Swiss-Prot record:
Pfam families xref list: Aminotran_1_2 (PF00155)
InterPro entries noted in UniProt: Aminotransferase_I/II_large, AspAT/PAT-like, NHTrfase_class1_PyrdxlP-BS, PyrdxlP-dep_Trfase, PyrdxlP-dep_Trfase_major, PyrdxlP-dep_Trfase_small
Gene for this chain: aspC
Protein name: Aspartate aminotransferase
SUPFAM superfamilies the UniProt entry points to: PLP-dependent transferases
EC number(s) given by UniProt: 2.6.1.1
Chief place where the protein resides: cytoplasm
N6-(pyridoxal phosphate)lysine modified-residue sites: K241
Keyword Methyltransferase set for record: no
Coiled coil: none
Source organism of this protein record: Sulfolobus acidocaldarius (strain ATCC 33909 / DSM 639 / JCM 8929 / NBRC 15157 / NCIMB 11770)
Spans traversing the lipid bilayer: none
Molecular function via GO: L-aspartate:2-oxoglutarate aminotransferase activity; pyridoxal phosphate binding
Highest classification ranks of the organism: Archaea, Thermoproteota, Thermoprotei, Sulfolobales, Sulfolobaceae
Length: 400
């Protein structure tokens, strides 16, 4: 038996590809001493709000450091159930909530619960790159539905193609709204239509709503607003983005009670429980929405700055982000003239100008192959400097 003889599931997946570009940036900074402008960041740059930190200290000092239930602490489950019930005018019991060590674990539990080898999971392209990786690890098959893009309106869900891709092996559709990497907030009518398709075909909708408070334009539709949500959906969210708690690793799932019970059985055998004192602190997060609003207002200003700066660059087509904290400009003309792929573009931009962007072709197939993702989770002055460097780099490409 060789330690190099990995399982089929392990061999089916690759690492987090965005980290590659962070590694290149670190090397460039070390070798050339260039100040790095990091538009590759997928987390808010705000510290966790003071009240949450204070409650964590209080929990630690009070000795709240033992195991909890695999479901998570009752106080936090009840808080989430009450909050979402009020927000979406629905009825959620605390028994329909499980706390997890991050929204990624929530997604993993959902996939693990339903995906058998050979099952198909529909994933929109572009989308967050981890979705298909976990499906492949479990022996499932990601089936990609290419989103529609228009220069004037940006990306939208291709529901006709979605229907055409459904087979008797299709188990689930993955929805992310607001959307990473495109920054779209999908039209509520599109979401309603997707839900109706899923219901008619007896499919599960796995809805990743981690960016639900990062909405600058339009109205976000949650699956929990559908009166029949318990019969078709698994809702995933977490504390990382809204409350700037990425390192705390806390997420949660809302689903009908027997689904949550089965998830808790998996949890008990995989990670036992989420961190006790982090859960205790997270209860207070729901009292920090004044801080959340200030953060979102700041992000909206940053979005406006990045959009206006990118619009100045000849050859770029950019739609103003409606949600999340990403801009996803189209570089087709620049790439054709330079002979580069977006991966080439991103690597060379780091090496020559010290600016990190993430190539669209990693999200996760090819619908984003002429786009790059830029995060505006950085200071406005940093945005201006980074886009200026990017402009200089593009001008050099267009002249050569």
């Amino acid at each position: 038996m060789s330690l190099d003889n990995f399982s089929k599931g392990a061999l089916a997946i690759s690492g987090e590809t965005t980290l590659l570009y962070q590694d290149i940036a670190r090397s460039v900074q070390k070798e050339k001493g260039i100040k790095i402008v990091n538009f590759g960041i997928g987390q808010p740059d705000f510290p966790t709000f003071q009240k949450i930190r204070d409650e964590a200290k209080k929990a630690l000092d009070g000795g709240f450091t033992a195991y909890t239930s695999a479901y998570g602490i009752d106080e936090l489950r009840a808080k989430i159930a009450s909050f979402l019930s009020s927000k979406y005018n629905t009825n959620i019991s605390s028994k329909e909530v499980i706390i997890t060590p991050g929204a990624k674990v929530s997604l993993y539990l959902a996939f693990l619960l339903y995906v058998n080898p050979g099952d198909e999971v529909i994933i929109f392209d572009p989308s967050y790159y981890s979705y298909p990786e976990v499906v492949k690890m479990l022996g499932g098959k990601p089936v990609y539905v290419k989103m529609k893009w228009r220069e004037d309106t940006g990306f939208s869900l291709n529901l006709n193609d979605l229907e055409n891709k459904i087979t008797d092996k299709t188990k689930m559709v993955v929805l992310n709204n607001p959307h990473n990497p495109t920054g779209m907030v999908f039209d509520p009518k599109e979401i309603d239509q997707l839900i109706e398709i899923a219901k008619s075909k007896n499919l599960i909708v796995l809805s990743d709503e981690i960016y639900d408070y990062f909405v600058y334009e339009g109205k976000m539709r949650s699956v929990l607003e559908d009166p029949d949500w318990k019969n078709f959906s698994i809702y995933v969210n977490g504390f990382s983005k809204t409350f700037s708690m990425t390192g705390w690793r806390l997420g949660y799932v809302v689903a009908k009670e027997n689904v949550i019970k089965k998830m808790s059985e998996i949890a008990a055998n995989v990670y036992t429980c989420p961190t006790s004192f982090a859960q205790k602190a997270a209860v207070s997060a729901f009292d920090t929405f004044d801080d959340v609003k200030k953060m979102i207002d700041t992000f909206k200003k940053r979005r406006d700055v990045m959009y206006s700066e990118l619009k100045k660059i000849k050859g770029i087509q950019v739609n103003k982000s409606q949600g999340a904290f990403y801009m996803f400009p189209y570089l087709g003309e620049i790439l054709r003239k330079s002979g580069m792929s977006t991966k080439d573009f991103s690597v060379n931009l780091i090496k020559e100008k010290g600016v990190v962007t993430i190539p669209g072709e990693v999200f996760p197939l090819d619908a984003g192959k002429e786009f790059v993702r830029l995060s505006f989770a950085v200071d406005e002055n940093v945005i201006k400097e980074g886009v200026q460097r990017m402009s200089e780099f593009i001008n050099q490409l267009m002249r050569s």
